[in-house]
Amino acid sequence: MRNYDTPVRAIRHKVYVEVAKAGFESTDETLIHDIEAIPYNIVEEKAKYRESIYRERAVASERVRLAMGLSLRPENKAVHLTDGLAASNIDEKYYEPPLMQVIPSACAACPPNKYIVSNMCRGCVAHPCMQACPKGAISMKDGKSYIDQDKCIKCGKCKAACPYDAISHNIRPCEQACGVKAIGSDEQGRASILEDKCVSCGMCMVSCPFGAISDKSQIFQLAHALRGGEKIIAIIAPAYISQFGDDVTPGKFKTALQVLGFSDVHEVAFGADVGAIAEAHHYAEKVATGELPFLLTSCCPSWSMMEKKFFPTMIDNISQELTPMVATARKVKQEQPDAKVVFVGPCASKKLEAMRRTVRSDVDFVLTFEELDAMFDAREIDPASFEEDGSLHDATAAGRGYAVAGGVAGAIEACLKEYYPDVPVHIEHAESLAECKKVLALAKAGKLKGCMIEGMACPGGCMGGAGTNVPVAKSSKELKKFLAGCTKKLPPKELVDIELN
């Protein structure tokens, strides 16, 4: 189970806080010095987690670069920590691909997929492990079972057969978390990301016990822009419920964002309402009539990327409706064309969606809840400390429910039943990339005809995204309570005619 209260997250938080402070406070004269000081502020006098203070500072230095949107430095030549700083010292979006990177000095080169016999082996007479192995890879050595790794095919039958649970399955946590098999190894046995397969969901990042994988952040550039007093509007994903403390209501959260420097705050759930109505209409017009065999949702960018990379023949079945982020951003910019828009959410891969040619002008920055929490700390803002002052009233329970696995399909289904009662509805949904691949394989095989298929890359949906602050079970429970209290349950049918192009 994913753990949120770990030293890895604490270190990431410290880095984000320090980088945010630099964006808010450093001058052109002090910036280089302030950035160079961050690894020393984080790792002071003694190494806590690695063999030396020098290695810990080396890792911290790479984290600082990624937090500023810069790429890792090469290992085979000397490159200064602040190399490239001039290009990233701006008040607008900055991004050097790729989004996800493995920090080599942080990676422990964990053993790859392997079954091994532990000291729990009793050397029993029956040898059920030997009998179960289809390749004859198990023999007896010094009175214990021994697995020949050259013969082993990693089927796991020996482990299942052992009555003492003496055979363990070692697999890299990052590799185990990746549902598209995008984790490989470099020449030194360290993890590497296969860019042709990676869909940037971030599950490898949050699963690595060494914190060796990280995404790039726009926290520095956004702090720079907020400091400059620009008109910047936050659009917040519906998964924000409970992310900043049990006592932080929507009204308090809105106030905290305004104190941080945002001129206004809107719910991305508005765009989800627009999408739910539009996709219900699309389903009724195209899928229910047989014109399309099935329809795939498009709000999760990692799910959409997976379809395009692994199931390219199914691209025409992906919904062409605007994602909630884009629909909300366009609505804001229609009304306030001079404003910059910041998407605040649980998702790492939204950073890539915002870099698409067709989206780049709509969304100026993408910030995760984890990064926003660090920005609050950098400015000593406690969202729970504010008085209740207004709230957020942009959306319905249907749109707000997009945050949980099954919520997208559920909202579309509810709209179909309300506004297209004569149309039969068939819904499928999958959460985690491994499950998403399975459901797409079924669709490709023609076994899901007439279905609206929702896919979420992260277990639990957006509530379990890589940039969240709270365990998915807790946050989903709080969201359910919040939805139950919503007065507006479904978006009006007229939203299908809204112009956001």
Describe the role of every protein-language-model region.
Residues M1-E75, D215-N501:
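Iron-sulfur-associated redox domains of electron-transfer enzymes in respiratory
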Residues P74-D83, K93-Y94:
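Acidic, serine/threonine-rich, charge-biased low-complexity segments
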Residues L85-A87:
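Mature N-terminal, pre-catalytic/accessory segment of carbohydrate-active enzymes
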Residues N89-S118, K135-G136:
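N-terminal [4Fe-4S]-dependent radical SAM core
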Residues M100-K114, C124-C129, C155-C158, C201-C204, ...:
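Cysteine-cluster motifs in flexible loop/terminal segments that predominantly coordinate metals
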Residues A108-I116, S139-K144, S185, M203, ...:
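Gly-rich Lys/Arg/Thr-decorated short loops/hinges at beta-loop-alpha junctions or inter-strand turns
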Residues C121:
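Conserved, function-defining core regions and hallmark residues within catalytic/recognition domains
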Residues A126-Q149, K157-L194, V199, M203-Q218:
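Iron-sulfur cluster-binding cysteine motifs and their immediate structural context
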